[in-house]
C-alpha cells in the first residue's frame, strides 16, 4: 500500500515537475535570505567581539585636562580594573605632501615608548609601529591611509604649536577605536577624506606639546559590569585634573555606529526570509489545492481500495515536503555564497582588524528545517481536505454550482469564459491573486528602499546642505571676515556657520550632538519640515531637532531642555534651557539647529568667542572658479577644513554603497520569486483546465483564440493580485523603514511612480510570460486522451 502511494508520489512529481521546481525556488530564496543574512550578521558580531577582545578595546574612557602620568598606576590598583593606559590625544591641523589633499584634521594618539599600549592595541596591516627615540615616526589609521594612498616611507606633517613638523610613516594600522574612523559623537560619520589618526611614540611628542610627564586621557578594560561604576569614581576622584564625564564602550563613537548598523541589519534578516518562506507556503497550498481537486477521482478510488485517511494525508504532505526539501538544499548552497559575499563586502568597507568567516552549520540546518516546515504547512490544508473526502463523494466529483449572476450578463464569449472561470470558485481565485500579490509586496519593498535612499540623499545634499564649499576655521573669528571672501572672483554667496558640541538633557535622558547656528533666510543650509517639506527657522529660545533625535529623546514640540556645551571648564562654560520646536527632516546625522544670533549670545559670548563669532563659512561658487577658491582657502593658515559638496557626496555614496548592494540583491531575489510564484499560479490553472481547453480545440478553437482566453483569465488574476499587494507592500516597506533606522542614517519612506508602475505591471508581464510553457503543452496534447481525463 505504501509502495503504491510512493509510486503515485513520484508520478505526480514528474507530472508537475516545473511547478515543484518553481515552489522550491521560492523556498530556496527564502532559505538563502535566512542563511545568508544571518550568517553575515553572526560573522560581523563575532568579528567585532574578537577584534575588541584581542586588541583590548576600552570599556571606559575618561578625558582629562591635564594630569600627571602617575595617576595611571593609582588607577590600576582600583578594584575591578584589569588594564589601564594613560595617553595624550590631541586634535590638530595636518599638512600633506604635494599631490594629496592639502590640509586635513588630524588626531595624534600617543603610544608607550616601546610596547603596545595596555588598552586599545593596534593591529599592524603594513610596515611596523614607530620605534621612538630621535626619529619622528608615525603609524596611520588604515582608512585614512587608504584614501590618501599612504605607504610606509611617506612623510606627513602635523602642525604642533603652529609649527610644521615632519613625521615618517612607518606603518598602516587598524585600531578598535577607529573601525569607523569618526571624529566624535557630534560628527558621527566617517570622513577619511578630511580626518585621520596618527599614532606616535610618547617620548617623541610630549615635549613638543608641552605635556611632558602628563596624560589627558585614560582608557580602561574592566571586569564585566564595572565600567560605569569605575568611570564615575575616576571622574569624581580626579576632578581637580579636569576629568570629563566617562565614555563607556556603548557610547564610543565608532562602536556606537557599528552597533547601530547591526541593529538596523537585524530586521531585514528576519522580515525578508519570512516573506519568501510565507510565499512558498502559499504557493504550495495553491498548487496542491488544485491537484487535490483534479485528483478527486483518484482519491476516491484509493479510499475505496482501503487506503486510510492518514495515508492520503501523508501522501499530499509528502508532496509539499518534497518541494521544501528541494528548496532547502538550493537555499543552503545559495545562502552560503550570499553569506560569504555579505561578509566580504562588509570587511572591505570597514577594514575590520580581525574578520571571522564561519559557515554556521546550525543556521543552515535551521534554514533547511524552515523550508520543510513552510512547505509542509502550506500542504497541510489541501492534504486534510483530501483525507476528509469519503470514497463516494470523491468519486462522484463536485456538483456544478448554480448559475452565477455574472453568467446572466450578456458578454462576448471571449470575455465571458475567463470571467466565469474566475467567479466560479472565488476563494481559489482570491488565493491565486494573493500569491501574485506577494510578489507585488516584494517589488514595492525593494523598489521603495532604493527610492527612499535616493530621495534622502537628494534632500540632504540639495536642500539641507545646499552649498558648494564648506570652510572650517582653526580658531573662531568674527563674522566680519566673510566680507573679504565675498569679494573673491567667482564667489556668489557666503554665509556664516557656527557649530558647537553640546549635551542635551531631557527627562533623565542625555545625548551628545552638535548645535548649529542658522542664518535667517539661509539659502545654503535649509531646514525642511518633516511634515510639509517647507523650509523652517528656529524661533528665539527654540531649537529644531531631527525627527530621529526627537524619537530617541522622546521629545515633543514645546518640551523644555537643558543644553550644555560639552567642553565646559572652570574658565569658560555655557548652558541654557531651551524649548524644542517642530521636527526637521534630515536623513544623515542628528544635529540640532538654533538661530545664529541666539547661539552667539547664549553660548559664544560665555565661551569667550569673538563678538559674532563663527567657526566656519558656507559658500556658493561659480563652477569655473571652484578649484581656485578652494586652493585659496587651503593656502590660508587660519583655515583647518575645506570641503566641496562633491567630496561630501562622494563620502556619503561610498557609505551607502553597502546598502545599495543589499537592495540590489533583494531586488534580484524578488524578481526571481515573482516569476516563480506567477508561474506556479498560471501553470496550475492550465493543468486544472486541460480537459476544458482540449474540448475547445476539438470544437474548432485555434491556439490563438485559446491563448487569448488563457491570457485574459491570467491577466485578470494578475491585476487583482497586484492591486491586493499594493497597500500591504507600502505598509511592510514602512515597517521595515522604521525598524532599520540607524544612529547616523534615518530615511523617510518614498515610493516613486516608477516603483508603482513596476509593482503593478511586473506581475501582469510575468504572468504573460509564465503561461507560455503551459500553452505549448496544451498545443501538443492528445486531444482524445485529454478529453477522457476525469475532470472535477
List the predicted regions and their residue ranges.
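Juxtamembrane segments of multi-pass membrane proteins
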Residues: 53, 59-65, 413-540, 544-547, ...
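C-terminal transmembrane helical bundles of large multi-pass transporters
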Residues: 497, 614-621, 630-733, 738, ...
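Membrane transport/envelope proteins' first extracytoplasmic loop
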Residues: 2-278, 290-293, 309-310, 348-349, ...
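Short cytosolic juxtamembrane segments of multi-pass membrane proteins
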Residues: 3, 388-404, 779-792
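N-terminal Sec/SRP start-transfer signal
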Residues: 1-34, 291, 308, 317, ...
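Short coil/turn motifs that cap or connect alpha-helices
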Residues: 151, 308-309, 390, 556, ...
Amino acid at each position: 500500500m505504501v509502495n503504491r502511494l510512493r509510486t503515485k508520489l513520484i508520478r505526480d512529481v514528474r507530472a508537475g515537475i516545473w511547478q515543484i521546481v518553481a515552489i522550491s525556488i521560492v523556498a530556496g530564496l527564502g532559505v538563502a535570505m535566512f542563511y545568508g543574512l544571518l550568517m553575515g550578521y553572526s560573522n560581523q558580531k563575532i568579528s567585532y567581539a574578537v577584534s575588541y577582545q584581542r586588541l583590548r578595546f576600552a570599556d571606559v574612557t575618561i578625558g582629562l585636562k591635564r594630569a600627571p602620568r602617575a595617576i595611571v598606576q593609582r588607577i590600576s590598583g582600583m578594584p575591578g580594573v584589569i588594564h589601564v593606559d594613560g595617553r595624550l590625544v590631541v586634535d590638530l591641523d595636518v599638512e600633506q605632501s604635494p599631490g594629496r589633499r592639502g590640509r586635513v584634521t588630524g588626531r595624534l594618539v600617543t603610544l608607550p615608548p616601546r610596547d603596545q599600549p595596555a588598552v586599545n592595541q593596534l593591529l599592524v596591516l603594513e610596515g611596523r609601529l614607530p620605534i621612538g627615540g630621535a626619529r619622528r615616526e608615525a603609524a596611520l589609521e588604515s582608512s585614512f591611509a587608504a584614501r590618501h594612498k599612504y605607504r610606509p616611507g611617506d612623510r606627513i606633517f602635523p602642525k604642533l604649536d603652529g609649527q610644521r613638523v615632519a613625521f615618517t610613516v612607518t606603518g598602516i594600522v587598524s585600531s578598535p577605536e577607529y573601525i569607523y574612523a569618526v571624529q566624535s559623537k557630534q560628527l558621527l560619520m566617517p570622513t577619511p577624506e578630511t580626518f585621520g589618526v596618527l599614532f606616535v611614540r610618547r617620548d617623541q611628542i610630549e615635549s613638543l606639546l608641552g605635556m611632558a610627564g602628563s596624560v589627558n586621557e585614560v582608557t580602561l578594560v574592566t571586569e564585566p559590569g564595572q565600567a560605569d561604576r569605575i568611570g564615575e569614581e575616576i571622574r569624581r576622584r580626579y576632578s581637580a585634573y579636569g576629568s570629563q564625564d566617562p565614555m563607556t564602550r556603548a557610547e564610543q563613537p565608532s562602536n556606537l555606529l557599528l552597533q547601530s548598523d547591526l541593529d538596523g541589519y537585524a530586521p531585514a534578516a528576519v522580515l525578508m526570509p519570512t516573506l519568501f518562506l510565507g510565499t512558498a507556503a502559499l504557493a504550495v497550498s495553491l498548487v496542491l489545492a488544485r491537484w487535490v481537486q483534479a485528483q478527486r477521482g483518484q482519491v476516491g478510488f484509493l479510499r475505496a481500495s482501503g487506503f486510510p485517511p492518514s495515508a492520503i494525508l501523508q501522501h499530499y504532505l509528502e508532496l509539499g515536503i518534497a518541494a521544501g526539501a528541494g528548496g532547502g538544499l538550493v537555499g543552503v548552497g545559495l545562502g552560503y555564497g550570499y553569506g560569504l559575499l555579505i561578509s566580504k563586502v562588509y570587511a572591505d568597507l570597514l577594514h575590520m582588524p580581525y574578520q571571522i568567516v564561519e559557515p554556521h552549520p546550525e543556521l543552515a540546518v535551521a534554514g533547511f528545517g524552515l523550508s520543510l516546515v513552510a512547505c509542509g504547512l502550506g500542504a497541510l490544508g489541501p492534504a486534510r481536505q483530501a483525507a476528509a473526502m469519503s470514497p463516494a463523494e470523491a468519486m462522484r466529483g463536485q456538483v456544478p454550482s448554480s448559475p452565477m449572476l455574472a453568467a446572466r450578463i450578456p458578454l462576448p464569449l471571449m470575455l465571458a469564459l475567463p470571467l466565469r472561470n474566475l467567479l466560479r470558485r472565488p476563494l481559489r481565485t482570491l488565493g491565486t491573486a494573493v500569491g501574485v500579490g506577494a510578489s507585488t509586496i516584494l517589488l514595492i519593498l525593494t523598489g521603495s528602499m532604493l527610492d527612499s535612499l535616493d530621495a534622502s540623499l537628494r534632500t540632504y545634499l540639495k536642500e539641507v546642505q545646499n552649498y558648494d564649499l564648506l570652510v572650517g576655521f582653526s580658531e573662531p573669528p568674527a563674522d566680519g571676515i566673510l566680507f573679504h571672501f565675498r569679494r573673491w572672483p567667482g564667489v556668489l554667496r557666503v554665509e556664516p556657520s557656527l557649530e558647537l558640541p553640546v549635551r542635551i538633557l531631557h527627562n533623565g535622558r542625555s545625548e551628545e550632538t552638535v548645535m548649529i547656528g542658522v542664518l535667517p533666510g539661509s539659502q545654503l543650509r535649509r531646514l525642511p519640515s518633516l511634515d510639509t517639506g517647507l523650509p523652517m527657522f528656529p524661533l528665539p529660545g527654540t531649537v529644531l531637532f531631527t525627527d530621529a533625535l526627537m524619537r530617541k529623546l522622546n521629545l515633543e514640540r514645546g518640551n523644555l531642555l537643558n543644553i550644555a556645551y560639552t567642553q565646559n571648564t572652570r574658565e569658560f562654560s555655557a548652558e541654557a534651557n531651551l524649548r524644542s520646536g517642530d521636527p526637521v527632516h534630515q536623513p544623515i546625522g542628528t544635529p540640532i539647529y538654533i538661530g545664529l544670533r541666539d547661539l552667539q549670545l547664549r553660548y559664544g559670548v560665555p565661551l569667550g568667542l569673538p563678538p559674532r563669532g563663527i567657526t566656519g563659512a558656507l559658500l556658493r561658487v561659480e563652477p569655473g572658479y571652484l578649484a581656485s577658491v578652494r586652493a585659496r582657502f587651503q593656502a590660508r593658515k587660519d583655515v583647518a577644513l575645506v570641503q566641496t559638496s562633491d567630496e561630501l557626496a562622494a563620502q556619503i555614496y561610498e557609505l551607502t554603497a553597502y546598502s545599495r548592494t543589499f537592495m540590489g540583491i533583494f531586488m534580484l531575489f524578488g524578481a526571481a520569486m515573482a516569476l516563480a510564484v506567477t508561474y506556479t499560479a498560471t501553470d496550475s490553472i492550465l493543468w486544472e483546465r486541460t480537459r476544458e481547453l482540449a474540448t475547445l480545440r476539438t470544437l474548432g478553437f485555434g491556439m490563438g483564440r485559446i491563448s487569448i482566453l488563457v491570457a485574459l483569465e491570467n491577466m485578470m488574476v494578475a491585476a487583482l493580485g497586484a492591486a491586493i499587494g499594493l497597500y500591504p507592500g507600502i505598509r511592510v516597506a514602512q515597517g521595515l523603514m522604521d525598524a532599520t533606522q540607524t544612529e547616523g542614517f534615518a530615511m523617510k519612506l518614498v515610493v516613486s511612480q516608477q516603483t508603482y508602475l513596476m509593482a503593478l505591471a511586473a506581475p501582469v508581464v510575468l504572468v504573460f510570460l509564465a503561461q507560455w510553457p503551459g500553452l505549448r503543452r496544451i498545443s501538443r496534447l492528445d486531444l482524445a486522451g485529454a478529453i477522457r481525463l476525469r475532470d472535477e
